[in-house]
Amino acid sequence: MVVLVEASPRGGAGDHPASCELDAGGDVGSGGRQYAAVVVGGTFDRLHQGHHLFLKAAAEFARERIVIGICDGPMLAKKQASRMYAYLIQPIEKRMENVKEYIKAMIASYHFQSIKPDLEVHVEPIVDPFGPSIVDEALEAIIVSKETLPGGLAVNRKRAERGLAQLEIEVVELVPEKSTGNKISSTAFRKKEAERELHKQQQEAPHEQAVELECRI
């Protein structure tokens, strides 16, 4: 049975530096390479197929423990200042719960027997760029995408400064969206939600104006 260890929202640090948006997943499979403890990080907003594949690939690299950091606090503030629709990012509690539920379902499924049933899973918020990735001596690898590879390199530089062993960096390929050829993106989902809300408001506006006119008459 998977052991899920949850840190309280806004009460922990994080794992994945530089870029916290793991918006797409990858070609699943560790190629037989495994590490006692691995770390991954991301926003994990509106958990989608890309996230699923990325988490599965990361879990396959883990022999005993996987730490999953989810962006919150100052990390989200940076995203909201630089990206459209970032204000629609789900609350940290919702994103943490979605990740936990997916991990539990994944390990319980017979399709995912390559993942150890007793894998220890830590789910915690990220409130700074590095968090436990530069203090946890037991970590052996960090799982990244091509986009977040610079973050993995930054972690190793910080670990070197602190006299800690370097982490192996495993890069998971991104999965393109079939319809567009682009990567699967949480930002795209937020954009669609914003457009639906705008369309709804535009449809309701004439009705509200008519009601106001009737009241005046």
Swiss-Prot record:
The keyword ATP-binding applies. Gene3D superfamilies: HUPs. InterPro entries: Cyt_trans-like, Rossmann-like_a/b/a_fold. It catalyses: (R)-4'-phosphopantetheine + ATP + H(+) = 3'-dephospho-CoA + diphosphate. Inhibited by CoA. This is Phosphopantetheine adenylyltransferase 2. GO terms for molecular function: ATP binding; dephospho-CoA kinase activity; pantetheine-phosphate adenylyltransferase activity. Its EC number is 2.7.7.3. One of its GO terms (biological process) is coenzyme A biosynthetic process. Belongs to the eukaryotic CoaD family. Pathway: Cofactor biosynthesis; coenzyme A biosynthesis; CoA from (R)-pantothenate: step 4/5. Pfam families: CTP_transf_like (PF01467). Keywords: ATP-binding, Coenzyme A biosynthesis, Nucleotide-binding, Nucleotidyltransferase, Transferase. Reversibly transfers an adenylyl group from ATP to 4'-phosphopantetheine, yielding dephospho-CoA (dPCoA) and pyrophosphate. Does not accept 4'-phosphopantothenoylcysteine as a substrate. It comes from the Eukaryota.
